[in-house]
């Protein structure tokens, strides 16, 4: 469809002709997501005419054609100016049924194709334009969406209508701090979205914080999964700072209720492995945000036939999280995005729940038998996590090390035993534990159990590599004392030269257990020695 001819027809104002021409243009460009720069001004002009045309009294078919055109044009972030002004956003909000006023007693519940197309256009525009985000805030679109969400269970709206309501809510709260705060505080968004989540999943409760989970139920349908994931994403946006502040009893009850629903989500499958993985990924992301004190509900359900039991506790959820970690480790891409949430969740849960820590330790760090290979060599979960401890991404490296350190109850010697000093050095240096000892966590005093294989090989294990090394011949065998002294001085001079030319900087462990320049470390040791000598003299 020639853009020039289309513009002429729009300017003519003939509704039937406009509808026919726009329908043809929409069909030709339905799969167009990249636009050439040459016709940008013509597309802007088309956008202005279409948004203006929508303010007329139009037949439904013409409304739909205009809104479809806006959806297509709004994919081009360089030609959005016709749609980002207050008037244009307000027009689209009216078609979507989101125009908000305090006097409005009931929200508009549109369910036609026009409303869905308007929502799609708004999603594109809000996503691509900061100006549009500000207008959406001024027009209180979040309030309109929240009002509609309150009737989520009572309306028979189509899947598309509900889905794009939720998608728009996610985008508004992701892109605007003010709208995020408004939904969370003024509109009680956590409660609102939790109710929508519960409704979509059609939950039944056996106890206050225990959902009835039918393990023989069919997988969650595609449409329900899509809506659930949008709800989880919106909840993530408005809860990301909760774990950093104190919550009162009412809030704690709300978050425990939500955690119980998220437990159910982890135990449900969706239609296909990839969709289930995505569904569980959003669930894990949200669980990380919740206060740790509220995650006890993950372990409270009664042990039933087929449940994973440990120390009398139901470990179904922890087992699912462990399998989820396995799969993400094997994928090996986008490690920060894929791994850090689940590693953080397992780490913090292990800190506060003894049963979780002991169960995970039995799975991840079973009694050590393989002392011939380096800790990072192999395909066990321990091997894969130890490999991550020297990853180039600092966040990934830290999360993997912290998880294993907590499973070792923050005991340095135990941590080194399972990972090797070379792999452990980064975390120990950051924690000031290079000289040994243990971290600040409070743990029970049960002992580590050494296998017979480990006890027999312990004396020959190289603590740096974490394995038994073959004995190497002593390079000084056969040397006279003069030759040894000569080689030693030669080595000292080489290090001295490298140090003076600032090619290397010799480091040592300081009194606070961290790495520091060797001269500083030596100076502090000398000062301590002098202080000790003075104390001895005074006696």
From Swiss-Prot:
> Where in or outside the cell is it found?
Cytoplasm, Cell cortex; Cytoplasm
Respond yes or no to whether keyword Cytoplasm is given for this record: yes
What are the alphabetically sorted keywords of the record? Answer: Chaperone, Cytoplasm, Guanine-nucleotide releasing factor
The record ties this protein, via InterPro entries, to: ARM-like, ARM-type_fold, Chaperone_Ric-8_A/B, Gua_nucleotide_exch_fac_Ric8
From its record, what is one biological process in GO terms?
A: G protein-coupled receptor signaling pathway
A GO molecular function term, named singly, is: protein folding chaperone
Pfam families in UniProt: Ric8
Protein family per UniProt:
Belongs to the synembryn family.
Record protein name field: Chaperone Ric-8A
Q: Which organism is it from?
A: Xenopus laevis (African clawed frog)
């Amino acid at each position: 469809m020639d853009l020039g001819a289309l513009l002429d027809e729009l300017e003519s104002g003939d509704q039937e002709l406009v509808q026919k021409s726009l329908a043809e243009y929409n069909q030709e460009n339905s799969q167009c997501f990249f636009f050439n720069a040459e016709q940008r001004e013509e597309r802007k002009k088309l956008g202005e005419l279409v948004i203006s045309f929508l303010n007329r009294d139009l037949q439904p078919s013409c409304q739909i054609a205009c809104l479809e055109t806006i959806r297509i044009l709004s994919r081009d972030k360089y030609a959005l100016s016709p749609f980002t002004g207050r008037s244009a956003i307000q027009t689209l909000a009216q078609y979507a049924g989101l125009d908000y006023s305090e006097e409005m007693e009931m929200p508009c519940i549109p369910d036609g194709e026009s409303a869905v197309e308007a929502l799609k256009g708004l999603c594109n525009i809000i996503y691509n334009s900061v100006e549009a985000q500000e207008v959406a805030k001024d027009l209180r679109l979040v309030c309109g969406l929240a009002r509609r969400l309150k009737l989520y269970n009572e309306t028979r709206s189509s899947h598309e209508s509900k889905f794009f309501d939720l998608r728009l809510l996610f985008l508004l709260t992701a892109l605007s701090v003010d709208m995020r705060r408004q939904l969370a505080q003024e509109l009680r968004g956590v409660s609102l979205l939790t109710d929508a989540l519960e409704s979509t999943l059609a939950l039944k409760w056996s106890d206050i914080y225990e959902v009835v989970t039918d393990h023989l139920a069919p997988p969650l349908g595609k449409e329900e999964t899509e809506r659930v994931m949008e709800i989880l994403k919106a909840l993530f946006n408005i809860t990301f700072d909760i774990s950093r502040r104190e919550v009162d009893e009412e809030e704690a009850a709300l978050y425990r209720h939500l955690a119980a629903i998220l437990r159910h989500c982890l135990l449900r499958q969706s239609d296909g492995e990839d969709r289930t993985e995505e569904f569980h990924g959003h669930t894990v992301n949200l669980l990380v945000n919740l206060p740790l004190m509220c995650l006890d509900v993950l372990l409270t359900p009664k042990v039933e036939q087929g449940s994973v039991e440990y120390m009398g506790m139901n470990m179904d959820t922890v087992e699912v999280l462990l399998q989820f970690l396995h799969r993400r480790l094997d994928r090996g891409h986008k490690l920060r995005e894929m791994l850090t949430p689940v590693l953080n969740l397992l780490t913090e849960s292990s800190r506060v729940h003894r049963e979780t820590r002991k169960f995970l330790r039995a799975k991840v760090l079973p009694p050590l038998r393989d002392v011939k290979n380096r800790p990072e060599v192999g395909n066990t979960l321990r091997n894969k996590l130890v490999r991550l401890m020297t990853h180039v991404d600092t966040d990934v490296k830290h999360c993997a090390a912290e998880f294993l350190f907590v499973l070792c109850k923050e005991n340095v010697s135990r941590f080194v035993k399972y990972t090797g000093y070379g792999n452990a050095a980064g975390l120990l240096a950051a924690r000031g534990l290079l000289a040994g000892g243990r971290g600040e966590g409070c743990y029970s005093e049960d002992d580590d159990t050494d296998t017979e294989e480990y006890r027999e090989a312990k004396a020959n294990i190289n603590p740096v590599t974490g394995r038994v090394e073959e004995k190497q011949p002593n390079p000084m065998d056969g040397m006279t004392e003069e030759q040894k002294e000569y080689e030693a001085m030669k080595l000292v001079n080489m290090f001295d030269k490298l140090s003076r030319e600032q090619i290397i900087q010799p480091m040592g462990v300081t009194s606070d257990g961290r790495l520091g320049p060797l001269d500083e470390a030596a100076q502090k040791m000398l000062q301590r020695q002098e202080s000790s000598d003075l104390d001895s003299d005074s006696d």
